[in-house]
Amino acid sequence: MSVESFTPTAIQFSQGAASKVKSLVDEEGNPRLKLRVFVTGGGCSGFQYGFTFDEDVADDDTVIEREGVSLVVDPMSYQYLAGAEVDYQEGLEGSRFVIKNPNATTTCGCGQSFSI
């Protein structure tokens, strides 16, 4: 029997998203804040993305650092986000964090809901 080590596909934390997180953290004046990205059931397509700021990191969380700020993902959400990119976009419909997820087979027009 052979045993292979499993290396999860990294989640990308874009330059634009990191810059926006840094700006928001600086604005709050709390350098302990991290952007937590998570997946929950719901939305038009079955799952939806969520974003919140959090000071805490659990032992089993994945932490991705860029520009001195951190993106945190819990293990359940990571399985749906492996290979995805967390970005920040500004456009006519407003400014927001977005996830470009190659695992999603369908996405809602709002960009916050998806199915696998």
Swiss-Prot record:
A GO BP entry: iron-sulfur cluster assembly
Cofactor(s) in the UniProt record: iron-sulfur cluster
Record text on cofactor binding: Binds 1 iron-sulfur cluster per subunit.
Keyword vocabulary terms for this entry: Iron, Iron-sulfur, Metal-binding
UniProt GO MF annotations: 2 iron, 2 sulfur cluster binding; 4 iron, 4 sulfur cluster binding; iron ion binding
Keyword Iron set for record: yes
Ligand binding (iron-sulfur cluster): C44, C108, C110
One Pfam family from the record: Fe-S_biosyn
GO cellular component term of the entry, any: cytosol
Keyword Iron-sulfur: yes
Origin superkingdom: Bacteria
Quaternary structure, from the entry: Homodimer.
Reported function: Required for insertion of 4Fe-4S clusters for at least IspG.
Family, as annotated: Belongs to the HesB/IscA family.
Protein name listed in UniProt: Iron-sulfur cluster insertion protein ErpA
Natural source organism: Stutzerimonas stutzeri (strain A1501) (Pseudomonas stutzeri)
Gene this chain is encoded by: erpA
